[in-house]
Amino acid sequence: MKKLLCVVMALCLTMACALAEEAPALNWEDFAPALEAGGVTGQFYTFDEIAVAIWMPEGLNPVELTEEDVANGYIGYFAPDDQSAAVSIVYVDVNGMSLEDYTAQLESAGATEIEPGTVNGLPCVSYKLAEQDSVSIAFTTEAGYILEVTCTPLSVENAELVWGAVVASIQPAA
């Protein structure tokens, strides 16, 4: 419990610093030491479709995608055995839509707490969907696609910290 409290406090300080700026900037190098100090483990997964790597905490396991999932743009889905949480990674053709245009669509779709920022230098927009109890982050790509990572549930204890670490890990694959 003390390790988790240490991680929570360190991540809160990191997030407070990031949120103090006009456009929040998250960097994996800021989160990784706090996770390590707190004994929080996980591993990176690489998505070859977009040359991106994303860290998942231990206990979130890759779920095999169906043909329908793939047809709907899913390139990754992670959940614990009890299905009490999930992280989905979707890569969808939006015909070259800009991040600003995508943000406008989010507003009309009822998203809240829409916020532009950067993650490891990549421009993005984050938002929440109350009816889905989720937080998402979206990036545009040079190929005219949107990469969107959605984490749920958001309403459980420490969810924002865990999901914050997942989001902060999104980076170009080495």
Where are the model-predicted features located?
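Short, conserved charged micro-motifs
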Residues: M97-D101
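Short, hydrophobic/aromatic-rich segments at coil-to-beta transitions
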Residues: G38-F44, A71-G76, T118-K128
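Short N-terminal helix-initiation segments at or just after the protein's N-terminus
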Residues: P24-P33, S88-V94, T112-E115
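N-terminal targeting sequences that direct proteins away from the cytosol to non-cytosolic compartments
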Residues: C6-L11, M15-A71, A143, T150-A174
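Signature of long, low-cysteine stretches enriched in small and polar/charged residues
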Residues: T103-I146, P153
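Secretory pathway targeting signatures of secreted, lumenal, and periplasmic proteins
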Residues: T46-G96, A130-E131
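Bacterial Sec-dependent N-terminal signal peptides
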Residues: K2-K3
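Second-shell loop/turn segments in exported
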Residues: F44-T46, V87-N95, I114, E148-E157
